[in-house]
Amino acid sequence: MASFTKTVLIPIAHGTEPLEAVAMITVLRRGGADVTVASVETQVGVDACHGIKMVADTLLSDITDSVFDLIVLPGGLPGGETLKNCKSLENMVKKQDSDGRLNAAICCAPALALGTWGLLEGKKATGYPVFMEKLAATCATAVESRVQIDGRIVTSRGPGTTIEFSITLIEQLFGKEKADEVSSILLLRPNPGEEFTFTELNQTNWSFEDTPQILVPIAEESEEIEAIALVDILRRAKANVVIAAVGNSLEVEGSRKAKLVAEVLLDEVAEKSFDLIVLPGGLNGAQRFASCEKLVNMLRKQAEANKPYGGICASPAYVFEPNGLLKGKKATTHPVVSDKLSDKSHIEHRVVVDGNVITSRAPGTAMEFSLAIVEKFYGREKALQLGKATLV
């Protein structure tokens, strides 16, 4: 019996842009693709951009004879240069092209890799804004589309376009119905590229000394896009972000089996003070947060001190609501668990700030959520600059 599984290769390297890589991995897996994450380094662990550590499924050197329906390259520097200089990857991508199978790339990778390898000749392509001149020298027409399809090559621009890019790849592999299904779960922005906004009530200043100290806990089956968006964006803003694992291992497998590495165990920072504690979602991940007494106690102390705390996706419903952390507050959460909120007046809002509490809905709102935190700490101008730089 013929198999209808679609196989995808995503190579990663030291200096890969983690939000792009993680979004591609998780969105394509949501669509039903069999995704292999392969390190082009000599070990499966890679140090991605912004101090984020990822663990691949395998080494590229072990699978060079494998055939995939799609090979998709993330960006980031120096990761994009490393991918370009990987001869094994170049050979695989060129064979992919000559055999008429799909190739895709985002950010700097269209110019650095696909363009350098001669695969964009006669094609329309897009990429990260600062690479457009280089891209124009390697393709027929460099365009500013958020996602560009030309034949069997798909290109895109940067972190903020990655989910749209990945949805397009699902459509190429599985058809529009599956793409629309995944898109509706993720809650993509209705107006990508426009200035982000959020709903704010009971406005208060979020204070900090020198640099915001922010805790991002992660647990088994946490939603990876939400976790990495928070860390990626907040570190771009120069906040001091600590990734802490709930459990006994620093290595955590997210809800879509992407492997992330925390810097500390939550137990090691349970007595420390933070300017913000902010939780990613994921249904099972949020339930693990809710069952972690130390984390719940930290959140209660944060609330008692009137210090900011936040959550996205299932975390407001499963962690905040049952522990009284939304009492008197307007909040939002993922649509599938919104019935658990006692006050449902703001559940359709993408990001809600009520005094010292910030909540949001889903992977598709994670960058807006992160930028809203930047705005609360640093002001609107810096948040808009980051939004522009990441192409939200």
Swiss-Prot record:
Compartmental location: Cytoplasm, Cytosol; Nucleus
GO MF annotations in UniProt: glyoxalase III activity
GO cellular component, one term: nucleus
Recorded phenotype for the gene knockout or disruption: No visible phenotype under normal growth conditions, but mutant plants have increased susceptibility to oxidative stress-induced cell death and accelerated cell death in aging plants.
Alphabetical UniProt keywords: Cytoplasm, Nucleus, Repeat, Stress response
One BP annotation, GO: positive regulation of cellular response to oxidative stress
UniProt-listed Gene3D superfamilies: 3.40.50.880
Domain PfpI endopeptidase: start-end pairs: 6-174, 212-378
Annotated InterPro entries: Class_I_gatase-like (IPR029062), DJ-1 (IPR006287), DJ-1/PfpI (IPR002818), Prot/Nucl_acid_deglycase (IPR050325)
Induction of its expression: By high light, copper, hydrogen peroxide, methyl viologen and cis-jasmone, but not methyl jasmonate.
Origin: domain of life: Eukaryota
Chief location category: cytoplasm
Pfam families in the cross-refs: DJ-1_PfpI
Record-linked PANTHER family: PROTEIN DJ-1 HOMOLOG A, PROTEIN/NUCLEIC ACID DEGLYCASE DJ-1-RELATED
Quaternary structure (record): Homodimer. Interacts with CSD1 and GPX2.
UniProt family annotation: Belongs to the peptidase C56 family.
Function statement: Involved in oxidative stress response. Confers protection against diverse stresses by binding both CSD1 and GPX2 and mediating the cytosolic activation of the Cu-Zn-dependent superoxide dismutase activity of CSD1.
The protein, known as: Protein DJ-1 homolog A
Biological source species: Arabidopsis thaliana
